[in-house]
């Protein structure tokens, strides 16, 4: 039986979101959540979780290219812990190195510079995080 999984691309101003199914291993972007200094509208996130009822939530873990942590890594972990604490959902972390760069390249390839709006980039980043998580699950 397949799982429904939500993914979040944590940021201090915007949090990208995507939903996917483990059967297909693919994801689709959902509208990004605005955040103020990394604090989201928890009610809006709660509504999203209630609507999709995911079996698992994946949060992108922003690491430096050499695998070391940065300030945003700590904040993304805190966001993941709060998701679990507030909503009781199973949360996993996924290395997200290069997802924003890949997302920008994908969007630019489709529509040029004008297509590069922040919420699209965040949504596609969340898709890439989720799809790479699905790939890692098949390896295990």
Swiss-Prot record:
Its main location: cytoplasm. One of its GO terms (molecular function) is nuclease activity. Its EC number is 3.1.-.-. It is an enzyme of class 3 (hydrolase). GO terms for cellular component: cytosol. GO terms for biological process: rRNA 5'-end processing. Disulfide bonds: none annotated. It comes from the Bacteria. It is found in: Cytoplasm. Could be a nuclease involved in processing of the 5'-end of pre-16S rRNA. Belongs to the YqgF nuclease family. This is Putative pre-16S rRNA nuclease.
